[in-house]
Every structure is written in C-alpha cells, then in structure tokens.
C-alpha cells in the first residue's frame, strides 16, 4: 500500500487509541502508484477559529512531504491554480474544476477536508484543554472518486493520567498530532 494511504490510515489508528470520538470510513480500490503527485487543497474552516484551516493545511502538507513514495505539490502552486480557475471552496469541487487542477498541476490526487473544531475549553483544575476535529478526503483526479475518507477528533486531556500528567496543553501541538 502506498505511503499516503498508510500514513492516513495510521493517523486514524493512532487516534483510535486516544479517542472515543474517532470515526473513520476507509475505502480504497487500489494503492497509489509510487511517485504519485498529490496536491493538498486549503482545508475549509468550519470551526469559527481564525487561522485554524491554514494551520491544519500546513500540518497536512508537512506530514505528507515526509513520505518517500509521493510528491506533494507546493502550496503556492496550488493556490495560484485555484485563483486561476476561480475555485473558492476546495471541499465542493466540480468535475471540471478537478480536471483543471489535475492538468494545471500535473497531479493524480487531491487531499481536501474541513476543520470542524479547533478551540480550547476552560477546565477549573487543568486550565485550558485544546480540542481539534478534522475530516480528510483523498480524491482520484482521473475518476473523480473519493478513494479514502476519515474523521479525527482529539482532546488534550484524552491521554491524561494522575494529576494531569500526559495532557496536551497546546492547541497547535494537538492539531499537529491529529494530522500526523
């Protein structure tokens, strides 16, 4: 199986050990070819927290760039093509927009998604507890089909033990771990 799918599936397995709220639907018809070109589109921000989608998108690009079997398109090129074809929402792509991105960026796959929750909750005993929730889709540009999808939810206090040990206190740190 390709590195991209293994990484995304591994992310879901990792979070399964940390979360009772993890939901993941996994489907794949065939593994990605070695050297597949992937573009990460800007995640849609449904959380209401300013800057959340930019951070999650950046973390996703960094996580995928660690792989040796795929090539991740530079975000500046992705943004330029989205402007060129007037694509305003990366989560509501038409087939024509997907075809335009695929030919303009010379990619075979698109990663897109939404930031559902990105906030901190006050806890009188532990202070601020971060919470992050995202959904991610991997789309095959040739068939216009979603070949993988997943949802990940995490709270900073999920791995907490006695006296607050093990709790994640930073929203950015939790977001980074959710994407990994």
Can you say where each PLM-predicted feature lies in the sequence?
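Generic short beta-strand segments
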Residues: 114-120, 153
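Feature marks short, surface-exposed loop/turn motifs that line or immediately flank catalytic pockets
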Residues: 47, 119, 156-158
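C-terminal/domain-edge helix-coil "capping" segments
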Residues: 18-36, 101-105, 126-129, 139-180
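Bacterial N-terminal signal peptides
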Residues: 6-16
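Short, surface-exposed coil-to-beta transition loops
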Residues: 130-134
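Short, solvent-exposed loop/turn segments at secondary-structure boundaries
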Residues: 50-52, 123-127
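N-terminal segment of the mature soluble domain
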Residues: 35-42, 47-114, 145-149, 177-180
């Amino acid at each position: 199986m390709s590195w991209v799918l293994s990484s995304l599936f591994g992310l879901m397995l990792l979070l399964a050990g940390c979360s009772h709220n993890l939901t993941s639907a996994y489907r794949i018809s065939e593994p990605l070819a070695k050297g597949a070109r992937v573009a990460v589109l800007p995640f849609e921000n449904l959380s209401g927290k300013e800057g959340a989608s930019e951070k999650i998108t950046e973390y996703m690009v960094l996580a995928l760039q660690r792989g040796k079997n795929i090539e991740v398109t530079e975000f500046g090129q992705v943004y330029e093509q989205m402007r060129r074809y007037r694509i305003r929402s990366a989560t509501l792509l038409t087939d024509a927009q997907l075809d335009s991105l695929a030919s303009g960026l010379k990619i075979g796959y698109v990663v897109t998604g939404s930031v559902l929750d990105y906030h901190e909750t006050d806890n009188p005993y532990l202070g601020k507890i971060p919470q992050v929730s995202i959904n991610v889709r991997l789309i095959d540009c040739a068939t216009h089909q979603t070949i993988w999808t997943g949802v990940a939810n995490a709270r900073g206090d999920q791995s907490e033990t006695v006296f607050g040990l093990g709790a994640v206190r930073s929203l950015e740190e939790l977001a980074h771990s959710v994407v990994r």
